[in-house]
């Protein structure tokens, strides 16, 4: 469960290291975001010569949460930290060309097939 002010790790090579959620998209009073949801983020920590810089406001998709995601068979997939992949504001395609760490099968929609194909492991 990601809400406003939540700090997340970045799971791609866009140049950002830590980001903060500033808005959960998808409704005027929506409070929480889970795996597969799009959020508005600001870059809090970035590496030099990256594609993004500190202070940029972009969209991102949540790929891992500590809360986890419940499957129809009753199992729950949980992770050690919250992570997201930064998206281009207009096309909503990933800015980075590599994805680090596993992602869940819940991202397998028409929008995020690029992330699934770049990920080293799909759980």
Swiss-Prot record:
UniProt cross-references to HAMAP family, sorted A to Z: Ribosomal_uL14
MF GO annotations: large ribosomal subunit rRNA binding; structural constituent of ribosome
PROSITE patterns, alphabetized: RIBOSOMAL_L14
Keyword Iron: no
Keywords carried by this UniProt record: Ribonucleoprotein, Ribosomal protein, RNA-binding, rRNA-binding
Superkingdom in the source lineage: Bacteria
Gene3D superfamilies the UniProt entry points to: Ribosomal protein L14
Encoding gene, per UniProt annotation: rplN
Record-given protein name: Large ribosomal subunit protein uL14
Keyword Ribosomal protein appears in the UniProt entry: yes
Function: Binds to 23S rRNA. Forms part of two intersubunit bridges in the 70S ribosome.
GO CC annotation, single: cytosolic large ribosomal subunit
Subunit structure: Part of the 50S ribosomal subunit. Forms a cluster with proteins L3 and L19. In the 70S ribosome, L14 and L19 interact and together make contacts with the 16S rRNA in bridges B5 and B8.
Recorded family membership: Belongs to the universal ribosomal protein uL14 family.
GO biological process: translation
Pfam families: Ribosomal_L14
